[in-house]
Amino acid sequence: RERRAPMPLAEGRVRCRTPLGARDGIAARNLLGAILNEGGLARDAIGRIQVRDSFSLVELPEDGLERLLGKLKDTRVGGKQLKLRRYRED
């Protein structure tokens, strides 16, 4: 399957990755709800959410990212740990 180039990021946002994806029964709304509820962000602070088969990508504000990831450290979605990390494209 052909790899798609990621969409360009809006200024001030970074892409984060979770190992949860469609195979885990995860939908974008599940990730959105968890990040809004546990992270305390406003809806407009969260950018594009891309759910792939075996992982998902979420665009989040770069400012305060480490604090946000700390808040989400123990968050579970669909009974599985979110494990959200900053995504570095190689």
What are these regions (language model features)?
Residues 3-90:
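Terminal-proximal interaction/regulatory segments of ATP-powered molecular machines
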